[in-house]
């Protein structure tokens, strides 16, 4: 791209273009929208990013993101500590929360096993999951993983690893369409899959 | 949207969702990408936005955006001061610069006349354009406006207003597809339309 907009604006466009969903063209549109709406958009977004950079951290219990550690969900005494819902990423946790079908705790794996991408168990938060599942009072681990090859491989691997802990291991029902990533599903589908979950 | 990700992250998602090209879902993905790539993406974008908010201003001559006023283009002595290219918005100016087919100066109107949206001449930078066009040494004003109803209405209005100034008034050739916004065009189309421009 020619440096037509000055180095500061080109740098801003370049960074915006790295966001998923924004290509080089839409990044330019976004930069322009920001620069035209300085007080309503540019300044607040700048503040929100600075605050997120300074304050948001990873929950040492579940792996979610929050400004407190343990996170608000892990600290919430009204939530059912006997249920742990395992998700691939924080985006899937957010989708579960929006669906409002689950009132237990979470465990963010940080990815899926993948032979193709060379992701093994050590790259995921599997050990901490087994440890949490073995704590007294934990009754059920729900594997809310995508219905993809990697998702199902990971689910079966986790079911084996959790066999030693005295917990029921379940999976989301087949309401999740094949190949479907959780965070692209509508809330109703997620709620239904949660209600109809089955043993792994 | 349920406040599933904590107020700070929800605020960030809400602001990202206001960017053109990002809906609520892609804004969540973007927020997650930012939070996962703190050092490579979140911190640099936060800095770039803060710098843009502090340093980028509107050029008092042409209406473009830059960290200096007059902007780099208006200050560039190697550019042809006898040509003024009128564009709707800064995004169109950037598109012209990327096409590399124009080495004169610009004038950013700040919009188009629109009966429907109630945009009259006073809402646009028409007076300053007429003043600039009347300065000695200005030879041609090129109306690089979109080939839409509002774009063409605006072009004809400007041609009338510029009749008193001793300048040639031209328009981009019909290489610009009907309904086409300049900043979505490929560079070759823009360059061709510039070369084949015709009297307004
Ligand atoms: Zn937590
Ligand atoms: Zn300028």
UniProtKB/Swiss-Prot annotation, chains A, B:
SUPFAM superfamilies: Recombination protein RecR. A zinc finger (C4-type) spans 59-74. Disulfide bonds: none annotated. Gene3D superfamilies: 3.40.1360.10, 6.10.250.240, RecR Domain 1. Keywords: DNA damage, DNA recombination, DNA repair, Metal-binding, Zinc, Zinc-finger. One of its GO terms (biological process) is DNA repair. InterPro entries: DNA_Rcmb_RecR, Rcmb_RecR, Rcmb_RecR_Znf, TOPRIM_dom, TOPRIM_RecR. Residues 82-177 form the Toprim domain. The keyword Cell cycle does not apply. The keyword Metal-binding applies. It comes from the Bacteria. One of its GO terms (molecular function) is zinc ion binding. Belongs to the RecR family. NCBIfam families: recR. May play a role in DNA repair. It seems to be involved in an RecBC-independent recombinational process of DNA repair. It may act with RecF and RecO. This is Recombination protein RecR. It comes from Phenylobacterium zucineum (strain HLK1).
């Amino acid at each position: 791209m020619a440096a037509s907009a000055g180095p500061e604006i080109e740098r801003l466009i370049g960074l915006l273009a790295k966001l998923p969903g924004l290509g080089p063209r839409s990044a330019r549109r976004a930069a322009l929208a920001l620069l035209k709406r300085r007080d309503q958009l540019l300044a607040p977004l700048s503040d929100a990013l600075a605050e997120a950079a300074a304050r948001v951290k990873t929950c040492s219990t579940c792996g979610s993101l929050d400004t407190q550690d343990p996170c608000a969900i892990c600290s919430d005494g009204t939530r059912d500590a006997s249920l742990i819902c395992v998700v691939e990423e924080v985006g899937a946790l957010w989708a579960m929360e929006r669906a409002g079908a689950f009132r237990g705790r979470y465990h963010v794996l940080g990815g899926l096993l993948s032979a193709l991408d060379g992701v093994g168990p050590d790259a995921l938060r599997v050990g901490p999951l087994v440890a949490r599942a073995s704590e007294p009072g934990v009754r059920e681990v729900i594997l809310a993983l995508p219905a993809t090859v990697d998702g199902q491989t990971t689910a079966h691997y986790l079911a084996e690893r959790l066999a030693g802990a005295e917990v029921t291991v379940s999976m989301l029902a087949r309401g999740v369409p094949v190949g479907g990533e959780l965070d692209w599903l509508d809330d109703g589908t997620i709620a239904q899959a949660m209600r109809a979950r089955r043993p792994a």
